[in-house]
A protein has these predicted regions:
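Short proline/glycine-enriched turn/loop motifs at strand-loop junctions of beta-rich domains
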Residues: 19-25, 55
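Substrate-binding/active-site clefts of carbohydrate-active enzymes
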Residues: 140-310, 316-335
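Structural beta-strand segments of beta-rich domains
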Residues: 12-16
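The feature marks proteins involved in alpha-glucan
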Residues: 1-11, 36, 43-46, 54-138, ...
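Conserved alpha/beta catalytic core and glycan-binding cleft of carbohydrate-active enzymes
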Residues: 87, 115, 318, 322, ...
Length: 417
């Protein structure tokens, strides 16, 4: 793609670019307090572009104009303020509100604003600390230190708390080689939770893939970068659990927050206008589209530049569906051929909820895979089930029945989120 999507700094000013192929027009919305200034964007091959004389720290969003025809996959509503899919920082957390789903109701006061970032250094990331065969510790960032007495109160429940000496000492005592952070990018509660007085605590309902939830990193990306540096010094790598299979905009009754309002037919897999639900969340992203894959790859590069060792891909089979699972899907080659990503740790959750979605052992060379057969057979042996000794031996020696000749690809686990 010739135009860099998201925000980029040019000699002529700050450039904003967003894909909206079916939109009649798109507006850039700049915010000064509650005042909204709208600027028409120019269209170039389905990408809408605007240049404004604004500085880092400027708050912004988009409005897309076009037809409302859900049966055709078109869900435009210019009253909805839309968050930039390439945003790297937000001014607040997402809060579910029923008005986010109501057509014709303005949502400028209900959604976070993206923040124009300062230019980033583009130095190549250091090689991963973690090597396959090491011990991975999965954790929820907020819950892990929320009540830890040794962590200062202002740090508890944040990413920076993970680099506190008491936390690092705990990891070292356990022999941890890498921590795997459950989703840290900005997410929204599912609509059934607020009426019950509940919140989504785990974060598996993301809205935009590159912006860390402000509650976990009040100081922005630098807090993740600094934490990664501190943990690397202790010999501990960082792996991010990424949800690139769906967005928190849910089904046809869900909120319009970003991708749905900009380019639903591009981003969501929706043949004949019907949203596919192989993630059990109301929608899935369509990785057969090059625009969607570009966003996914941009997300991986973005976090790789911050020094993370690699990624665990939630419901990873969805990334290779077209509509069925394809072990030669374009996303695999694009990751393998990307200079920033070639040496990153790649871990697949090798299943989804769709037809023939269980694909353990079928990901390409270079990928590790969560091995639920190890989990089940070890648990059965511990429980005392008869006839399990042979299966236990197979699991303890690399699951050769699944990973023939590639036993080092198995990620063995007994418990997870």
């Amino acid at each position: 793609m010739s135009v860099a999507l998201g925000v980029s700094h040019t000699a002529g000013g700050t450039q904003f670019a967003v894909t909206a192929r079916d939109a009649e027009r798109v507006e850039l919305c700049l915010f000064e307090g509650k005042r909204e200034i709208r600027q028409a964007m120019q269209r170039r091959d389905g990408v809408h572009i605007a240049v404004a004389g604004v500085a880092p720290g400027q708050r912004y969003g988009y409005r897309a104009h076009g037809p409302w025809a859900p049966e055709q996959g078109l869900m435009f509503d210019s009253t909805k303020l839309l968050v930039d899919p390439y945003a790297t920082r937000l001014d607040s957390r997402f809060q579910y509100d029923a008005r986010l789903s109501l057509r014709g109701v303005d949502t400028a006061l209900l959604v976070p604003k993206a923040i124009v970032p300062a230019p980033m250094d583009v130095a190549a990331p250091p090689p991963p600390v973690f090597t396959p065969g090491g011990l991975i510790y999965e954790l929820n960032v907020r819950g892990f230190t929320q009540k830890h007495p040794a962590v200062p109160p202002q740090l508890r429940g944040t990413i920076r708390a993970l680099a506190h000496p008491a936390i690092i000492a705990h990891f070292k005592k356990l022999g941890v080689n890498a921590i795997e952070l459950m989703p840290i990018v900005a997410w929204i509660d599912e609509r059934h939770l607020p009426p019950l007085g509940l919140r989504n605590a785990w974060g598996y309902n993301p809205v935009v893939p590159m912006a860390i939830d402000p509650g976990l990193a009040p100081g922005g990306l630098e807090e993740l970068e600094d934490t990664v540096v501190d943990l690397r010094r202790a010999g501990i790598g960082v792996i991010l659990d990424l949800v690139l299979n769906h967005t928190g905009e849910s089904d046809l009754l869900g909120p319009t927050l970003s991708l749905r309002g900009l380019d639903n037919r591009c981003y969501a897999r929706a043949p004949d206008g019907a949203l596919v639900n192989h993630a059990g969340t109301g929608n899935i992203l369509d990785a057969s589209d090059s625009v969607v894959r570009a966003m996914m790859l941009g997300t991986l590069r973005h976090f790789a530049r911050l020094g993370v060792d690699g990624f665990r891909f939630d419901l990873a089979t969805i990334l290779a569906r077209s509509p069925g699972f394809d072990p030669r899907a374009p996303i695999f080659a694009e990751i393998a051929n990307d200079p920033l990503l070639q040496d990153r740790i790649l871990i697949a959750e090798p299943w989804d909820m769709g037809p023939e979605g269980y694909r353990l052992g079928q990901f390409p060379d270079g990928w590790l895979e969560w091995n639920d057969r190890y989990r089940d057979d070890v648990r059965r042996f511990w429980r005392g089930d008869g006839g399990t000794l042979g299966r236990l031996a197979t699991r303890m020696t690399g699951s050769s029945d699944i990973f023939s000749g590639k036993c080092s690809r198995s990620v063995n686990f007994v418990a997870s989120h």
